[in-house]
């Protein structure tokens, strides 16, 4: 009788999630008492009853979306298996509107209001907070890291502690100190392009930029570059995680049920660090050597260890986890941004010509190019912003949150509901942008100008680095690297895209990350 009290019924008379959970507690006992013949009878009945519940009585039953998505994770698994997640989710929003049900317990929003509600956590409180715990990213964190880091830490106070410890590595003062290291690596990168120009060979510039960013970020992190073989391991594991994404989607669905969810958690925690990723990328011996080296300069680790003077002490595992995470996350986001920006610039040579005019008109020599000067170039920054608007590096299931019970856009989401705010859709929505599907870098140069054709663009809809307490800490570092690489590239070289038949949205895989993007160019040294 207790199961039928008011706590299990919503205000609209429909049962809430507790009723379903009670059924899952009782079901195993019933199954034990059944013989095979009874299972044949009751099995289909249970299946039909479950479908009826999800379609008509579940808390998300009134939210539009594909019927297959409402009753099972198969729709999401199919999209992930097809590696077109961003495009598929946007198609659903185009068809059904700003709020779409994309799984039995998952709802996707495509509004600025939802972006703010979900990612602005209430200080110190659980009520109304949307957490990472129980999401796929949290699940991968349990399987991957020796200790939680600022990407995976779920509780508010624990995350604030780690963020405070890591923050000093990304201060404006540290960025200025780190620039000579960045410039040195870009000079080495340009020597490769010089050789390609002399030999008149085609260059997979995405691959070379990946090597550049890996060397640069690992040097900035630990005072010396990590081996390229570690980058190969990292890329292999990225592909593995994305290949496993359909199965991980099933596991996340199972986590919402008490018995099955508890069993899944037990399996995951019983085999910790399945991928051993941080120790593969940053061996413990390398970390120890870095910490003991007397000549440590302006690397991330020095800044993080320096935070101990403020009373924030990280364990060896926490140092390893956070240091490796900074390299790995920064690597993927920075390379994606560089590759996508060059892709758009070279698809329309006029865009590249306009940017070359700006950069070459501002500087007389490559030596004059520095972080402070290029931060003020409107078209350079507009070219980068526009690429990230159309192809946000952070979009995907990694930005999902789990509701603890709260409202988003006037819709109450009970505890246990997975909430997605789809940046890919928002940043391409005609509701917020003029000419939303077209690469228009000039829209950013005209911000604040009256009577501009882009004056009604809603810039709060542009959040490639997220917002709130979990906004990307390395945002300014990533932008500084991208600006420096592009500015020196367009100043010194003329590039022509060779693989012009490559279409990013059609040919790239999108699930947890963008995979498979490749820009191949012919390089010509700029005439004096």
Curated annotation (Swiss-Prot):
Pfam families found in the cross-reference section: p450
UniProt-annotated location(s): Membrane
Topology in the lipid bilayer: Single-pass membrane protein
Domain of life of the native organism: Eukaryota
List of glycosylated residues: 5, 204, 381, 395
Needed cofactors: heme
Enzyme Commission designation: 1.-.-.-
Keyword Transmembrane set for record: yes
Stated name of the protein: Cytochrome P450 monooxygenase btcB
Organism: Neocamarosporium betae (Beet black rot fungus)
Designated gene of the protein: btcB
